[in-house]
């Protein structure tokens, strides 16, 4: 049934053109079948890098370029690529992958098909290595509403403190950095044994740097919930999938490399400004997540 299945990789681009070029080339060089396409969505990059991306791949028939007229964020930007992949390219599978990642596995797509046929998962997440070849750490658990309310309170306090530090830094007054900065807390999942990452897991919150949407997903949904700009998309996706009785899966049979946060870093010349931006978006998205959990009667675990 899936001997001639097709897949499109949706790569959301913003500013960092070399990372996007490297990501797309890694797909083209390592995922060989003719029924593989790449859809690059330029999220209205202000530095003109979208033109560089378009011109770089203008002669590559498997690469499509979609410029957006405003920065729509992660969910809506990816949805533009998903919609093109589904309606124009008729792709069976869609892989939304960060532009600061590399696909280094030449049987990546064939393994995706095998995993899907074995599990009927709506969304598949790969094992993720960082540039030093360590595992990408992330929390696979949907927490309780009370947990996220506490996080919301913490984020608000953090924004207040970061704004103060930013003002003082502009005045030339250095304040020692808080090692426990609330906007940059490590997940409690970080303490998990590394064997976790070499084991298949069903119905976990997946990492958003690479999410593979399968045919059964598109029987119920057209893409991400459009209500967030940045952050918490993975938890909301998990809730949506669970609400219709579908499963997702983390599989170590497929893997990518993640270079982390290149696009977000490109926005700022000041670390405080970056942290304020990140934390404000976490506040907005955590509010959306709490509303989503309440509307779906999801209590977390």
Q: For the regions a protein language model found, what residue spans apply to each?
A:
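Short, acidic, metal-binding catalytic loop of nucleotide-sugar glycosyltransferases
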Residues: 25-35
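A conserved acidic beta->alpha catalytic loop
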Residues: 26, 42-53, 70
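A recurrent flexible, glycine/aromatic-enriched loop bordering the glycosyltransferase active site
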Residues: 162-184, 190-213
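Conserved donor NDP-sugar-binding/catalytic core segment of glycosyltransferases
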Residues: 102-140
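Glycine-rich, basic loop-to-helix element that forms the pyrophosphate-binding segment
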Residues: 68-88
């Amino acid at each position: 049934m899936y001997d001639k299945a097709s897949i499109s990789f949706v790569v959301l681009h913003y500013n960092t053109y070399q990372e996007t070029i490297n990501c797309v080339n890694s797909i083209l060089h390592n995922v060989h079948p003719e029924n593989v396409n790449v859809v690059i969505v330029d999220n209205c990059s202000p530095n003109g890098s979208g033109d560089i991306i378009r011109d770089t791949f203008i002669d590559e028939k498997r690469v499509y370029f979609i410029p957006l007229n405003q920065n729509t964020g992660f969910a809506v930007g990816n949805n533009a690529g998903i919609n093109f992949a589904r309606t124009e390219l008729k792709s069976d599978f869609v892989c939304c992958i960060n532009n600061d990642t590399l696909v280094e596995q030449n049987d990546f797509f064939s393994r995706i098909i095998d995993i899907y046929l074995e599990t009927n998962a709506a969304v598949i997440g790969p094992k993720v290595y960082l540039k030093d070849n360590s595992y990408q750490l992330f929390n696979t658990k949907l927490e309780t509403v009370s947990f996220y309310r506490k996080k919301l309170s913490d984020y608000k306090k953090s924004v207040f403190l970061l704004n103060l530090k930013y003002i003082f830094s502009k005045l030339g007054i250095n304040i020692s950095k808080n090692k426990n900065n609330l906007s940059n807390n490590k997940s409690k999942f970080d303490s998990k044994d590394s064997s976790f990452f070499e084991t298949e897991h069903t119905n976990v919150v997946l990492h958003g740097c690479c999410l593979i949407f399968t045919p059964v997903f598109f029987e119920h949904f057209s893409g991400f919930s459009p209500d967030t700009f940045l952050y918490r998309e993975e938890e909301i996706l998990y809730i949506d999938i669970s609400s219709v009785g579908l499963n997702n899966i983390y599989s170590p049979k497929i893997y990518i490399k993640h270079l982390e946060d290149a696009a977000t870093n490109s926005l700022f010349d000041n670390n405080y400004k970056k942290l304020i931006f990140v934390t404000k978006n976490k506040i907005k998205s955590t509010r959306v997540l709490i509303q989503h959990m309440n509307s779906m009667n999801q209590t977390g675990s």
